[in-house]
């Protein structure tokens, strides 16, 4: 086992990063980690055939969908169930064989001789768990490191981990019916590239930026899927204290699963609560219309073991981030979609009736607590609807600066920086936020500025798309570039969705992003130098110093 894909990966005193041994920091055991590597190796081979079929005018929707789902299962804190990975490895082998035959047929019909592909495209997985684990060394993210060096391994990892984030967002869009050929083509292109074990750093950097542009398309598609299905988010106060009654808790990111649970509990007297990244769901009109969507319970993912133990009903994990379930709630937590943990009940078919039955059998909340709320739903349409008011406040000097403080939360030391940054931001500045990092400060009383709330919750991590559209619209209004706006991006990262968003920011030319609490362990000093020198990426320091730097007058170019 070797894994260094997330922010919490083990780090030695010398600075070397990576989890090994029997279990990673996230709780992923060695066997599961190795099986994930084997699956990704197979996906590279599938990508080789998909790209060649695309070049011959053939498309394969099953392959496109499987790639997204399978990559999603390998994200941090998504699926820990080795049996599911053994099944997916077998499925991948059958799919690869079918694609190989389809490619040979298509090439023959086009009067071409098909390439004899080796490596990942020719990989034959063992037919036993022991055999699969013995094959993991050829699939490791560090395979060939002694020959190619750490910089190449790190750049390949940046591509792979960004690709995982892209796939996760694309899967969320796909389940709501939003698919685009450009997305499937971009994903397969990177898999095909990685299958060839690239060593050219400049080529891989260009491909990483191209992947960032693909991710912008993916986030646009997911935005279209979410708003097309559930309406454009509107500013909505969300109760954060419970009400008396039976209850279900829904965590993760998947709005379709939340909608299905709301439908399944309609007229049952069961209340539904969101958790973590599901908080922004309350801003979507068609979801908010369910009167039994009672509020948001708890905070960010890393606090779930305490929060889930105290919740008096069943819990559904619809996507990342799952932590090892504790005995106090293990028998009442369900997984759905790409999520998995050995021994937990899995909802594979969208039928949440077992969850409803569990809610009826559990006590629920026995009393209604005094109401407290937070506000979400400041999506691009809501903010741009007030654009004249915002622009007027900037021109009048009421708003001096915008801080986008967003991204993933986590348990590692140093994340209090984001709380301090938001709370220390001067009263003439606006705080925009997205992702579960908002829980660090979203109950703080920020007040108003120019008739607008000083803290605007834009949504989930994928709603970075809304933030970018807002920034581009403001740049157009002020007749300047995004980098010339009074706007600073202060990003907290944790896993691979954040890596995809980061690549999008770089691809769109957004400079001077502050990134923390630590920099990715897979990026070597040489790769970090590239990001610093070419894109102005900088690590966070202290809230006080970084605020002062952001607000300091900038020298004329």
From Swiss-Prot:
UniProt: [4Fe-4S] cluster binding residues: 3, 6, 19, 26
Keywords assigned: 4Fe-4S, Cytoplasm, Iron, Iron-sulfur, Metal-binding, Oxidoreductase
Subcellular location, record wording: Cytoplasm
Keyword Oxidoreductase: yes
Entry cofactors: [4Fe-4S] cluster; hybrid [4Fe-2O-2S] cluster
Protein name in the entry: Hydroxylamine reductase
Co-factor binding details: Binds 1 [4Fe-4S] cluster. Binds 1 hybrid [4Fe-2O-2S] cluster.
Task of the protein: Catalyzes the reduction of hydroxylamine to form NH(3) and H(2)O.
HAMAP family: Hydroxylam_reduct (MF_00069)
InterPro entries in the cross-refs: HCP/CODH, Hydroxylam_reduct, Prismane-like_a/b-sand, Prismane-like_sf, Prismane_a-bundle
Listed EC numbers: 1.7.99.1
Pfam families, sorted: Prismane
């Amino acid at each position: 086992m070797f894994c260094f894909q997330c922010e919490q990966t083990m780090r030695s005193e010398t600075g070397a990063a990576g989890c090994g041994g029997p279990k990673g920091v996230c709780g992923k055991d060695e066997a599961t980690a190795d099986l994930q590597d084997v699956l990704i190796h197979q996906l590279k081979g599938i990508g080789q055939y998909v790209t060649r079929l695309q070049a011959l005018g053939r498309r394969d929707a099953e392959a496109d969908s499987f790639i997204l789902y399978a990559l999603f299962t390998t994200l941090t804190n998504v699926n820990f169930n080795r049996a599911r990975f053994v099944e997916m490895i077998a499925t991948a082998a059958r799919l690869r064989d079918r694609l190989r035959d389809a490619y040979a047929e298509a090439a023959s019909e086009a009067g071409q001789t098909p390439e004899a592909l080796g490596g990942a495209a020719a990989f034959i997985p063992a037919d036993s768990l022991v055999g699969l684990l013995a094959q993991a060394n050829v699939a490791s993210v560090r395979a060939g490191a002694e020959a190619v060096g750490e910089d190449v391994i790190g750049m390949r990892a940046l591509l792979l981990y960004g690709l995982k984030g892209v796939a996760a967002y694309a899967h969320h869009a796909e389940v709501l019916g939003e698919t685009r050929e450009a997305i499937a083509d971009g994903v397969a292109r990177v898999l095909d590239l990685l299958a060839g074990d690239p060593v050219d750093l400049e080529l891989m950097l260009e491909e990483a930026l191209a992947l960032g542009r693909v991710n912008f398309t993916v986030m646009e598609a997911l935005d279209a899927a979410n708003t097309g299905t559930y309406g454009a988010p509107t500013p909505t106060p969300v109760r954060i204290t419970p009400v008396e009654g039976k209850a279900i808790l829904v965590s993760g990111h998947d709005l379709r699963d939340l909608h299905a649970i709301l439908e399944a509990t309609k007229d049952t007297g069961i209340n539904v609560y969101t958790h973590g990244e599901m908080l922004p769901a309350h801003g979507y009109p068609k979801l908010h219309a369910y009167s039994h969507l009672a509020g948001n319970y708890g905070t960010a993912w890393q606090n779930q073991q305490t929060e889930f133990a105290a919740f008096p009903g069943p819990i559904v994990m619809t996507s990342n981030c799952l932590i090892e379930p504790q005995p106090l709630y293990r028998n009442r937590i369900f997984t759905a979609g790409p999520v998995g943990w050995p021994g937990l009940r899995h909802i594979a078919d969208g039928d949440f009736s077992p969850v409803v039955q569990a809610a009826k059998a559990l006590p629920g909340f026995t009393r209604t607590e005094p109401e407290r709320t937070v506000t979400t739903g400041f999506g691009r349409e809501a903010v741009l609807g007030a654009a004249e008011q915002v622009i007027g406040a900037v021109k009048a000097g009421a708003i001096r600066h915008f801080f986008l403080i967003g991204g993933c939360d986590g348990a590692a030391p140093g994340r209090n920086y984001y709380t301090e940054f938001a709370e220390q931001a001067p009263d003439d500045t606006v705080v925009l936020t997205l992702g579960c990092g908002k829980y660090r400060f979203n109950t703080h009383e920020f007040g108003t500025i120019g008739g607008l709330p000083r803290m605007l919750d834009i949504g989930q991590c994928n709603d970075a798309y809304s933030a970018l559209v807002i920034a581009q619209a403001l740049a157009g209004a002020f007749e300047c570039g995004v980098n010339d706006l009074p706007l600073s991006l202060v990003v907290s990262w944790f896993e691979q969705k954040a890596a995809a968003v980061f690549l999008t920011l770089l691809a769109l030319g957004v400079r001077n992003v502050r990134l923390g609490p630590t920099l990715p362990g897979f990026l070597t000093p040489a790769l970090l130098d590239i990001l610093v020198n070419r894109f102005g990426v900088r690590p966070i320091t202290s809230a006080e110093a970084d605020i002062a730097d952001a607000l300091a007058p900038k020298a004329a170019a």
